[in-house]
UniProtKB/Swiss-Prot annotation:
Family: Belongs to the argininosuccinate synthase family. Type 1 subfamily.
Name of the top EC class for this enzyme: ligase
Swiss-Prot/TrEMBL keywords: Amino-acid biosynthesis, Arginine biosynthesis, ATP-binding, Cytoplasm, Ligase, Nucleotide-binding
Entries under PANTHER family matching the protein: ARGININOSUCCINATE SYNTHASE
Name assigned to this protein: Argininosuccinate synthase
E.C. number: 6.3.4.5
Organism annotation: Koribacter versatilis (strain Ellin345)
Gene3D superfamilies named among the record's database cross-references: Argininosuccinate synthetase, chain A, domain 2, HUPs, Single helix bin
Binding site for L-citrulline: Y86, S91, N122, R126, S175, S184, E260, Y272
Catalytic reaction(s) noted: L-citrulline + L-aspartate + ATP = 2-(N(omega)-L-arginino)succinate + AMP + diphosphate + H(+)
């Protein structure tokens, strides 16, 4: 009986040539698993291409709702951003795809799983850590670490030799990844960090020059830290993110150019477009500023850094990530209300925020006397706060006097 290998298949250059390569080198049946996380491809065309390339079976998993509610929304609630800029679009999409791939492998009686990630990137860790956490009995095959192909140009030659049609060419050599949260762009002119992205690099958002010459306002409503409405209209998760992506993209929101530190120790340069996610993150931050006490807010910011690092490194299926999620969930109970954002040519400004759970009290915050806050109380507070500083100064001054004598 021939071995069955389940491949995470996208229809791109790498996975398109992996199907015939696996069959040639492992004498196996290849089951192509297509995880739909909102990449916008013609799924029927991707399925047809997998069959044409040699897949014995193609299984499509609609992961869009799961991706949003179980991965993207927790990231927004956490406030997770990697190295100040990256909203983890690709990092968040890999765990649900790998999970679905393992489920298919076990259901189909496969002995191995495979992916198209290079040996230099983060995705190999994200997929393989998930495989080991969920089904350690499955063999892992990583063609990029085995075959003799050394570059994307070599992959193009292999595709041409095997009659495989791909969208990439030597002139269009960018590596792109798209889902409901973002589009990433790597390779080509971007490999030189001193090169500005070409106008043709960006595929989703308008440039600031092309964006409207007027401000557009959008109000995002939250319940329990989760976005639930736009401009007062309740929406299901998929409809909500699609509308925010549309609004953000036409206003040039969410373009990011980043030199980042990969988990494997390599610095890389990528350009990302995250229109709707950027709006969600900005609105959620403003609502937390209203609703969280100082100590919780500040500590949560530390948690967000660690959470982002874990997810970027591919360590989704870990006890620590689950524990951090539990902490974040406890902070989100009172994150309810609405934030109005004003969008203009790539800029996001806050135009208003309101919450029934707000800790902000105008009567206390104002410069007016009274309202339950006696300004004289500040004197004792400041003296106690300054006690260590006064003590240190007295000791240091006493030491200086002895030296001068």
């Amino acid at each position: 009986m021939r071995e069955k290998i389940v491949l995470a298949y996208s229809g791109g250059l790498d996975t398109s040539i992996i199907i015939p390569w696996l069959k040639e080198n492992y004498s196996c049946d290849v089951i192509a698993m297509v995880g739909d996380v909102g990449q916008g491809d013609d799924i029927d065309a991707v399925v047809a291409k997998a069959h044409k390339t040699g897949a014995s079976k193609v299984i499509v998993k609609d992961l869009r709702e799961e991706f949003l509610t179980q991965y993207v929304y927790p990231a927004i609630s956490t406030g997770a951003v990697y190295e100040h800029k990256y909203l983890l679009g690709t990092s968040l999409a890999r765990p649900p795809i790998a999970k679905a791939q393992v489920e298919v492998a076990l259901a189909e009686g496969a002995t191995a799983v495979s992916h198209g990630c290079t040996g230099k990137g983060n995705d190999q860790v994200r997929f393989e850590h998930a495989f080991q956490a969920l089904a350690p009995e499955l063999k892992i095959i990583a063609p990029w670490r085995e075959w003799t192909l050394k570059s994307r140009e070599d992959c193009l030659d292999y595709a041409e030799a095997h009659g495989i049609s791909v969208a990439q060419s030597r002139e269009k050599i960018h590596s792109r990844d798209r889902n409901l949260l973002h589009v990433s762009h790597e390779g080509g002119e971007l490999e030189d960090p001193n090169n500005a992205p070409l106008d043709t690099t960006w595929t989703w958002t308008k440039s600031p020059q092309e964006a409207p010459d007027r401000v557009e306002e959008v109000t995002i409503g939250f319940e329990g830290g989760v976005p639930v409405s736009i401009n007062g209209m309740k929406l299901e998760p998929l409809a909500l993110i699609e509308l925010l992506n549309e609004i953000g993209a036409r206003n040039a929101i969410g373009r990011i150019d980043l030199v980042e530190n990969r988990f494997v120790g390599i610095k890389s340069r990528g350009c990302y477009e995250t229109p709707g996610g950027s709006l969600l993150l900005a609105a959620h931050r403003e609502l937390e500023a209203l609703c969280l006490d100082r100590d919780t807010l500040h500590y949560k910011q530390e948690v967000a850094l660690k959470w982002a690092e874990l997810v970027y490194f591919g360590l989704w299926f870990t006890p620590l990530r689950e524990s951090l999620d539990a902490f974040v969930a406890s902070t989100q109970k009172n994150i309810a209300g609405a934030v109005k954002l004003a969008l203009y040519k790539g800029n996001i400004a806050v135009a208003g925020r309101t919450s029934p759970k707000s800790l902000y009290r105008p009567d206390i915050a104002s410069f007016t006397m009274g309202a339950g806050y006696d300004q004289k109380d500040a004197e004792g507070f400041i003296r106690i706060l300054g006690l260590p500083a006064r003590s240190r100064a007295l000791i240091e001054n006493a030491g200086k006097e002895k030296v001068s004598k």
